[in-house]
Amino acid sequence: MQKLILILSLSLMFFSCSPKVLYDDPRKVETLTINFSSTDLQIISQAMVDSLLQSVITNNDNKPIIVIEEVKNKTAEYIDTSIITDSIRAKLSNSGLVQFGVNIDELDGQISEIDRQQNEYYDENLSVEKGKLAGADYRLAGSLISIDKVKKKLFKTKKDKFYKLSLQLWNIKTGVMVWADEKDIRKTEG
């Protein structure tokens, strides 16, 4: 009986000391480290979308079709840049001013679905015809880079991290770059 009480007491003490998990506002500024954060994602994606939507491509009556390539990670750290790409795509799509075509990464899936609908199990009047994919007007591409600096003095270390997101929009028909912008973020620690 005493062993059981001891085990229960230790278990209660162990679990009562565990950290509590709380939900927080995803738009709240995150300053836990100088590494890439959710705040950085929100800042750079919104800045790029705002800039692109003020460009000449959205000043006419037609909604241009854009294919977006995944942002390339040229930093020294692992950053899943698909979250940057997805955030920019969602914000642009929600603006209602542009449309998105099938990019190279999604093309195989799109072709497979069209091919699947061409068999005898589908009503030919309700199936998608081959050769009807819309071609894109523009291609959006870019990269994320970082520069890391560390300065050590006696018992103190100061770290500086600089991020730059660069995006370019290319007219597919002419091969001309029609828009480009960059967003910088600098963080220091120590």
How would you name each of these model-derived features?
Residues S18-V21, D137-E189:
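Amphipathic beta-strand/beta-sheet edge segments enriched in Tyr/Trp
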Residues L22-R27, I114-Q118, K153-K156:
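Glycine- and small hydrophobic-rich membrane-insertion segments that are intrinsically disordered
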Residues A47-M48, L52, I66-E70, Y121-K152:
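A short, hydrophobic beta-strand-centered structural micro-motif
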Residues S51-Y122, K132, I172, V176-W179:
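N-terminal segment of the mature soluble domain
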Residues N35-I43, Y78-I83, Y121, D160:
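Soluble non-cytosolic domains of exported or imported proteins
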Residues Q2-L8:
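Sec-dependent signal peptide recognition
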Residues S11-N35, G190:
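Bacterial Sec signal peptide processing site at the extreme N-terminus
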Residues L32-N60:
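N-terminal secretory signal peptides
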